Amino acid sequence: MKQVFGVFGDPIAHSLSPAMHNAAFSALGMDCIYHAFRVKPEKLEKAILGAEAMGFGGLNLTVPLKETALKLDCIKPDPLAEKIGAVNTIVFGETGEIKGYNTDGLGAKQALQNSAVEMEGSKIVVTGAGGAARSIAFQLAADGAEITIVNRTEGRAIELAKDISAASLSGNVTGKGLSGLKNLLQDANILINTTTLGMHPNVDTAIATAEDLHPDLTVFDIVYNPLETRLLREAKASGAKTVSGVLMLVYQGAEAFKLWTGIEPPVELMKKTVLEALQV
């Protein structure tokens, strides 16, 4: 019998995770299958316990379940997931323990590293202060990065920066309002956009234009629909290096795969599968 893995969320119909993980299982000759399941927050604990009872191999969680999962008594979060305040990967232990992890920030970090972006000593600007910004900023702060979080509502950026600072991580984190973005970018090495600006169908919007950017900057947009956002086009026009949001999706999935199976997945195949799905 195939071992089942899955992703819980609501909505979930357009998830690319099943195609990505099933391609990896098939390539490795593993008798496993990955499905998407629509689960509402109030049913999450029952769904997780049901998956455990049925012998699922592991789970991913997506919107709007990541924060809900951390509050469940049945899940033991790892220290970083607890600090972030969100879980996106569930591992069922052999002793009955259900462990929660957050691979989003690690996925973003690896997307940058595997695009030959120099991280050490870099000044990083993160736009947005939602769940994705939180995961990424916590991960990079744990690695000692200098980060400025910029958000339209300055108070949210400052609050997130305080949360990260209170976690006693080695990085230096501050929060600013959107009006200061242009000046911050002049001294920045990396810009990470975690807002939905530029996402389909609002494809003509961007957090910054070419005149705000420069050739010594790396611009990473976690939006991957469309594949090339307006921000990435503006970055190319300025001479900046660009990193696609597809890579974060793939690498966070690859980290989850390793947590479940202990096996290194075929990352290039996973990336190819996602790109093909997005181009249909």
UniProtKB/Swiss-Prot annotation:
EC category: oxidoreductase
Active site positions: 66 (proton acceptor)
UniProtKB keywords: Amino-acid biosynthesis, Aromatic amino acid biosynthesis, NADP, Oxidoreductase
Pfam families, per the entry: SDH_C, Shikimate_DH, Shikimate_dh_N
Gene Ontology molecular functions: NADP binding; shikimate 3-dehydrogenase (NADP+) activity
EC number(s) from the headed UniProt entry: 1.1.1.25
UniProt-annotated binding residues for NADP(+): 128-132, 151-156, 222, 245
Record field: catalytic activity: shikimate + NADP(+) = 3-dehydroshikimate + NADPH + H(+)
Pathway noted in the entry: Metabolic intermediate biosynthesis; chorismate biosynthesis; chorismate from D-erythrose 4-phosphate and phosphoenolpyruvate: step 4/7
InterPro entries for the chain: Aminoacid_DH-like_N_sf, NAD(P)-bd_dom_sf, SDH_C, Shikimate_DH, Shikimate_DH-bd_N, Shikimate_DH_fam, Shikm_DH/Glu-tRNA_Rdtase
GO-annotated biological processes: amino acid biosynthetic process; aromatic amino acid family biosynthetic process; chorismate biosynthetic process; shikimate metabolic process
HAMAP family named in the record: Shikimate_DH_AroE (MF_00222)
PANTHER family reported for this sequence: BIFUNCTIONAL 3-DEHYDROQUINATE DEHYDRATASE_SHIKIMATE DEHYDROGENASE, CHLOROPLASTIC, SHIKIMATE DEHYDROGENASE
Function: Involved in the biosynthesis of the chorismate, which leads to the biosynthesis of aromatic amino acids. Catalyzes the reversible NADPH linked reduction of 3-dehydroshikimate (DHSA) to yield shikimate (SA).
Protein name in the entry: Shikimate dehydrogenase (NADP(+))
Species of provenance: Methanosarcina barkeri (strain Fusaro / DSM 804)
Lineage of producing organism: Archaea, Methanobacteriati, Methanobacteriota, Stenosarchaea group, Methanomicrobia
